[in-house]
Amino acid sequence: MKLKKIIACAAAFAMTATCFAGCGSTSDSAADTSAETSAAAENDSAADTSEETSGEETSDSTDGEADPETRTIVDHTGAEVTLPANIDRVVISSILPLPSVYCLFRGSADDIIGIHPSSMAAAENSYLINVFPEIANADTSFVENGAVNIEQLLSMEPDVVFYSAANTEERDLYDNAGIPAVGFSTTMAGYDCIETYADWIELLGDIYGDSESADKIIEFGRNTASEIKAVTDNIADEDKPKVLILFNYANGVITAGGSDFFSKYWIETAGGINVAADLSGSAEINMEQVYEWDPDIILITNFSPYLPEDLYNNTIEGHDWSTVSAVNNGKVYKFPLGMYRWFPPCSDTPLVLKWLAKTIQPEKFADIDMDSEIKSYYKEFYGVELTDDDVQNIYTPA
């Protein structure tokens, strides 16, 4: 399947489209899940500090005159970071979904010289590497067994490293090595996925001095959230289905998404009731708990290898799903997989919210044509035209 490339006026979208690859492999999802949940456990006090200061730009000069060769920004930890005015060598470390957001904002992965191995695994099994094939050239060797090898990183000569603001020890490594490092938070927006996505874009706008591009992307996301909430805020609780997100389900272990996690935002904003709301973060559950909740809808993320058919056919050893309402009524769904897994914030976040609203409240959102929404978004923000087959492959990761 070939992508037809849109010839856009903006140079940001001047990239080569390639064949659409299968985007459903979850063989590396266990490592990714661990990193995602680790990043979601950030210190709230750091987030509070950054919320007040992030986005402020200061000069890097002792005499009050701006240095034209540097730019000083405030990251999501509240730290002032002095960066080169022209950034050509970027490493993206422990903030795993950020490569997709970076490519959305910059329109290219040309400046990315290194990414986390888990981010590379995700890219190779998603749409990202097809639209931005240059990301395949990024080096992953600076991370060994989940830890940063600072000597290897120094040999790559990065202008800046982007990392998860939760990882204070990682930040110490960069500071001690004299590498400019910018922390991106997953929690400062209270697990609001649209606002987290907006925070990341805004910080990239500060880093590159391009608030105009940032504002366009942020506006689209916030408008999407406003449109969905205008409907779901007026739905009575008795008209909201009970929803269970299986955040990670493999090897006999079921992990559900509770409160203080992205699942809360997704379910409640899209018009559902989170049956796991009494749990904190992502928590292990058993089938007895599932039977007690008896969810109307089950959503399986791409951090799990299972598909809806595995529950419908009751083929998962040791777990009997046959009596659960969502299974009996054919309402088990796998999250789609576009530029990144559609659960944590990523470059496709506005589409995730529309898909969830359509899935959880189909009658209320009958006017949403997801095929058209996906094609329009990819054309406007990535500069590619998707075929019907491309869209179906996003919906049905293997």
Predicted features by range, described:
Residues 1-10:
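Bacterial Sec-dependent N-terminal signal peptides
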Residues 6, 24-101, 212-246, 366-398:
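Bacterial Sec-exported substrate-binding components of ABC uptake systems
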Residues 18-22:
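C-terminal motif of bacterial Sec signal peptides marking the signal peptidase cleavage site
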Residues 89-93, 111-116, 160-164, 181-185, ...:
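Structural recognition of the beta-strand scaffold that forms the well-ordered cores
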Residues 94-152, 160:
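A short, structured surface patch at a secondary-structure boundary
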Residues 140-145, 150-163, 287-303:
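Proline-aspartate-enriched helix->loop->beta-strand connector
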Residues 170-252, 276-277, 327-397:
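Extracytoplasmic substrate-binding proteins
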Residues 255-281:
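Alpha-helical, coiled-coil/dimerization segments enriched in small aliphatic residues
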